[in-house]
């Protein structure tokens, strides 16, 4: 485990030196506070509205940002080391490829987790201090669940980045594929489901369609953050299908964890077969 931690510490140190942690934390804090106070501006309201509305807006924002940030953070984790000649050096040490991959995942995962905690935690603290009459128990429960699920979503896409980075031979190829993965899961997947609904006039296997949401970690993430507020009415579009999904919230959490585990195993299998 010392070898794993040494690699993780190196990745964390690189993130601090490159200002990744500071930049992500600041971005999350500014956007979260802005959404909390200006999220209802389109309807003519300024100021904090409600915890469910704030969490729903933040979850929608994080659905776009977390995957992109995670992919940009780790797309060159393997191919970048290979191009720079440091991967060959690493493999001369008594280190297994699994240890290298796990160390990178721990280091990058800590960067994302700390950024989420600092950025969104500051927003929760600002609401607690500045909004009169807010229910603190519900506020910290909702933000705690939101921050944990956001971190897990980021970890899913870190694992995706390792899969891509282990598969290609050039950083530019990894960057292009990373953007393609982001488009697929964040934009294209839901559009395809909506197209199925529209073209079939709502008749496309209504029992199967809600289960298809589990094939997209971003949809699982949004369902987790919308499911805890009964009657909030925040689920729109494809996510409204989640109301027909006969599974408890715990299963959604397990599905998100499964995405991380399966993706890391796939990344390891690809990395193990990679020739340096």
From Swiss-Prot:
It is found in: Cell inner membrane. Its main location: membrane. The chain crosses the membrane at residues 20-40, 55-75, 111-131, 146-166, 179-199, 251-271. One of its GO terms (molecular function) is ABC-type transporter activity. Signal peptide: none annotated. It is a multi-pass membrane protein. PANTHER family: ABC TRANSPORTER PERMEASE (PTHR43471), ABC TRANSPORTER PERMEASE PROTEIN NOSY-RELATED (PTHR43471:SF1). The complex may be composed of an ATP-binding protein (NosF), a transmembrane protein (NosY) and a solute-binding protein (NosD). This is Probable ABC transporter permease protein NosY. It comes from Stutzerimonas stutzeri (Pseudomonas stutzeri).
């Amino acid at each position: 485990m010392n070898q794993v931690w040494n690699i993780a510490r190196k990745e964390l140190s690189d993130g601090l030196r490159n200002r990744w942690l500071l930049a992500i934390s600041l971005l999350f804090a500014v956007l979260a506070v802005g959404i909390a106070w200006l999220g209802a501006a389109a309807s003519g309201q300024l100021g904090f509205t409600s915890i469910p509305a704030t969490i729903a807006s933040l979850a929608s924002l994080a659905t776009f940002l977390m995957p992109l940030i995670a992919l940009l953070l780790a797309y060159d984790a393997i191919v970048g080391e290979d191009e720079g000649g440091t991967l060959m050096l690493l493999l001369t040490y008594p280190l297994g490829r699994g240890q290298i991959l796990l160390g990178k995942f721990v280091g990058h995962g800590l960067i994302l987790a700390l950024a989420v905690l600092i950025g969104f935690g500051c927003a929760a603290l600002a609401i607690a201090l500045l909004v009169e009459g807010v229910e603190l128990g519900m506020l910290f429960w909702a933000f705690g669940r939101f921050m944990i699920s956001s971190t897990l979503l980021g970890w899913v896409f870190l694992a995706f980045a390792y899969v891509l980075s282990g598969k290609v031979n050039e950083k530019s190829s990894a960057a292009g594929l990373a953007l393609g993965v982001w488009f697929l899961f964040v934009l294209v997947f839901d559009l395809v489901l909506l197209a199925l609904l529209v073209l079939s006039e709502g008749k496309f296997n209504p029992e199967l369609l809600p289960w298809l949401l589990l094939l997209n970690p971003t949809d699982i993430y949004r369902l987790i953050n919308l499911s805890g507020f009964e009657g909030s009415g925040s689920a729109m579009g494809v996510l409204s299908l989640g109301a027909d999904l006969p599974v408890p919230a715990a299963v959604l959490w397990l599905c998100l964890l499964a995405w991380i585990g399966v993706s890391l195993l796939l990344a390891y299998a690809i990395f193990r077969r990679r020739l340096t």
